[in-house]
Amino acid sequence: MNPSTTQARIVVDELIRGGVRDVVLCPGSRNAPLAFALSDADRAGRIRLHVRIDERTAGYLAIGLAVAERAPVCIAMTSGTAVANLGPAVVEANYARVPLIVLSANRPYEMLGTGANQTFEQLGYFGTQVRAAISLGLAPDLTGPNAADLDTLNAQWRSATCRVLVAATGARSANAGPVQFDIPLREPLVPDPAEPAGGTIPPGRPGGRSWTHTPPVTFDQPLDIDLTPDTVVIAGHGAGEHPNLAELPTVAEPTAPPPANPLHPLALRLAHPKQVIMLGRPTLHRPVSTLLADPSVPVYALTTGPRWPDVSGNSQATGTRAVTSGAPSAAWLRKCAELNEHAVTAVRKQLAAHPMTTGLHVAAAVADALRPGDQLVLGASNPVRDAALVGLRPDGIKVRSNRGVAGIDGTISTAIGAALAHDGRTVALIGDLTFVHDSSGLLIGPTEPTPRSLTIVVSNDNGGGIFELLEQGDPRFSDVSSRIFGTPHDVNIGALCHAYHVDYHQIEADALGAALEDPFQGMRVLEVKADRSSLRSLHASIKAAL
């Protein structure tokens, strides 16, 4: 067996032993040893392999798989720009703490700087965005008088692979995230002609165990908090479970655990709490940001890892869990419950009275159609905010969204990855710009695994509706804002779906519920035409009703 093939097979075997079950592969020549090894593992039923053409979207496919599976996922690619295309996914994985392993095949390092084709200094390319950048080193000659000792190499290669897995899963840091595993490969890049399929490699540990076992670290920082003052909980992305805080009024973002005592984000301005407990990282609502920045309101930050958010610098203490004393007053709980009910009712009444279909109407229709066992994937920009405003019935529903750096890129691919890892129905709600941006993510080859049931709902207001609600949407900029911020595109979404052989229907918002109730297997797109010109007035009417 040649060196590159041997090395690749040992690495793949050890990755599987370390918990990798899904791998995304992008085609190339330099990563051929990895491709053959991964294909063998796929045929043996040890992994599920997903082959994609575009590394940028493939990275987000891996993120969707990793988030839904709560397990490390690898993406393998060839050298050169193939590696650079992983940049956006790596950044998202960093801030969302997703265990994404970038298996970047490389040329032998002596070829760097020589003008060799498809070669650049890719080891360390991702800089501070990865938990580690680890090189396996070039596999030496395994035959002849100067042959290296294969047992020694087996131990070294498996040990290095375990370091990659530990860094990605955060087993020793409580801070999962992306890792670059750079593997220089010398020709020959294909298995030897006389070699049997699958070949043989030196064994790993008995019983399928990892070469180097690393128990996950326990990260526990208790924080004393008195609940007697009027307290609200702000539950952001990655909030974690805190049963002893369940009684408190909670403004929960859609990706946070469902609150037992919800407080609508628009009701927060009227609540006037005396202190805040912040869980995870809030990413959505301006009333939340305003409250967290108020120096007169103490903020206590509880996170599940070593980092904590504090945009305004106002947090008084941090920890991982609250040790509570005291109890909220009945009057405070009653006040917040009334404010929440008033806000929920106001939103729904204003939606019913509004003459145009907007993204909020589409989000409400999707939210009302969800049922226990569903998985909901929300696009960045307006969809995730709309879902928070119309209110979700979160019991038994898993909600996903790329909130690490909150970009619109890769959302279709993320949804497909999440759907591939989910046994039930997945519904994705995204905007038209998000859809167009990642439309190549719809490409699933005829031999590839496909989602069991994925419906992508596209709220199409022909541009960036969120800018209607920001300063850029002020009427005084009306002569230029539509072009330079709204960016109308007039893309035929149905034609795009047809090109990728994806089932497509255009429907009205009030027909969404019935459409989502129909049993569906596979992947489809439902487009709902929406209006963004009236978004500003709709949101103003909701605030006025409060």
Swiss-Prot record:
Pfam families membership: TPP_enzyme_N
HAMAP family xref list: MenD (MF_01659)
GO biological process: menaquinone biosynthetic process
Keywords, in A-Z order: Magnesium, Manganese, Menaquinone biosynthesis, Metal-binding, Thiamine pyrophosphate, Transferase
Organism listed in the record: Mycolicibacterium smegmatis (strain ATCC 700084 / mc(2)155)
Family stated for the protein in its record: Belongs to the TPP enzyme family. MenD subfamily.
Name of the featured protein: 2-succinyl-5-enolpyruvyl-6-hydroxy-3-cyclohexene-1-carboxylate synthase
Main function: Catalyzes the thiamine diphosphate-dependent decarboxylation of 2-oxoglutarate and the subsequent addition of the resulting succinic semialdehyde-thiamine pyrophosphate anion to isochorismate to yield 2-succinyl-5-enolpyruvyl-6-hydroxy-3-cyclohexene-1-carboxylate (SEPHCHC).
Enzyme Commission code(s) on record: 2.2.1.9
Catalytic activity from the UniProt record: isochorismate + 2-oxoglutarate + H(+) = 5-enolpyruvoyl-6-hydroxy-2-succinyl-cyclohex-3-ene-1-carboxylate + CO2
Enzyme class, broadest EC rank: transferase
Pathway: Quinol/quinone metabolism; 1,4-dihydroxy-2-naphthoate biosynthesis; 1,4-dihydroxy-2-naphthoate from chorismate: step 2/7; Quinol/quinone metabolism; menaquinone biosynthesis
GO molecular function: 2-succinyl-5-enolpyruvyl-6-hydroxy-3-cyclohexene-1-carboxylic-acid synthase activity; magnesium ion binding; manganese ion binding; thiamine pyrophosphate binding
